[in-house]
Amino acid sequence: MAIVGLGTDIVKIERIEAHVARSGDKLARRVLTEAELAIYIAHSQPNRYLAKRFAAKEAAAKALGTGIGRGVSFQHIHIGNTPDGAPTIRFTDGAQQRLAFLNGVFGHISIADEKSYAIATVILESC
């Protein structure tokens, strides 16, 4: 096994709150998959949830070496949780193609937040 990609992103939660106050759910609908959007809508702290998912997807795009764009969309990166609450990451479409190009087979993700910030790190691994 080898590391083929590493990415980290940090988001100021206040920035997400300001964007949502100005534009409603526009950012959430651009960043989140349908499954993630359903969780966001029902979440007790939706802006914090959105900030963590935004950081996670940006970190994943950095690990892929593309950033968002250039064939990789927010919609191609799916962030979930195990039954125990640990974050999971899954790639589809352009993100999956880029992972295959890197000979990657699996992504590891860590997401954390505190009062003002959300941060995520993604490690991509080959077999």
UniProtKB/Swiss-Prot annotation:
One GO location term (cellular component): cytoplasm
Compartment list: Cytoplasm
Database matches in InterPro entries: 4-PPantetheinyl_Trfase_dom, 4-PPantetheinyl_Trfase_dom_sf, ACPS, Ppantetheine-prot_Trfase_dom
Keywords of the record: Cytoplasm, Fatty acid biosynthesis, Fatty acid metabolism, Lipid biosynthesis, Lipid metabolism, Magnesium, Metal-binding, Transferase
Recorded GO MF terms: holo-[acyl-carrier-protein] synthase activity; magnesium ion binding
Enzyme class, UniProt record, top EC level: transferase
Catalytic activity: apo-[ACP] + CoA = holo-[ACP] + adenosine 3',5'-bisphosphate + H(+)
The protein's Enzyme Commission number: 2.7.8.7
One GO term of the biological process aspect: fatty acid biosynthetic process
Residues that, per the record, bind Mg(2+): 9, 58
Listed NCBIfam families: acpS, pantethn_trn
Family: Belongs to the P-Pant transferase superfamily. AcpS family.
This protein's name: Holo-[acyl-carrier-protein] synthase
Organism: Shewanella putrefaciens (strain CN-32 / ATCC BAA-453)
Organism lineage: Bacteria, Pseudomonadati, Pseudomonadota, Gammaproteobacteria, Alteromonadales
